[in-house]
Amino acid sequence: MQSTTEISQKGLNDMKELNIMEATVLTSPNPLTLICSKKEDGSTNLAPICFVSYLSFNPPMVGFATGKQSHTGKRVRETGKVIVTVPCESLAGAVMACGASTGAETDKVAANNIEMMAVEGSDIQIPVDTRLAMVATLQQSVEVGDHILHICQVDKFLGDEDKKGLYAWNGFGK
């Protein structure tokens, strides 16, 4: 019979070292969110982001990370407001297209024909076909490597459990 040490060593020997892109494949699928923020002209910007996590139950907190040069991150830091949404599968093509351009130069809502709706108590709109919306206020932003982590208190959760959310498969390298 093998000892615990021998079994542990065998398991370790079966593992190989990965880079972060390979590691993301092993944690897929991840909810693919659309970060909704207010643009300078008052319209809504949409940015697909998978670097999102619940951070606290009391108070309810959520965090998301954007690249340091991200227009979306800049707008959230300037306005202090954001709505983190989980879009539905019907928006898969539009969500991918939203990730291909910056909201600083493109009206992503119009360019991708995304039907939007108002959220009570917010001047930021969200896609009509949304499974979950977290209306939030920025509490803190922290530089983390090549990204900025936005730590937000959730003011209100809105959800439709009958809708099917969109997920990112096979990590972030595809």
Give the predicted meaning of each segment:
Residues 2-174:
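Basic, polyanion-binding surface patches
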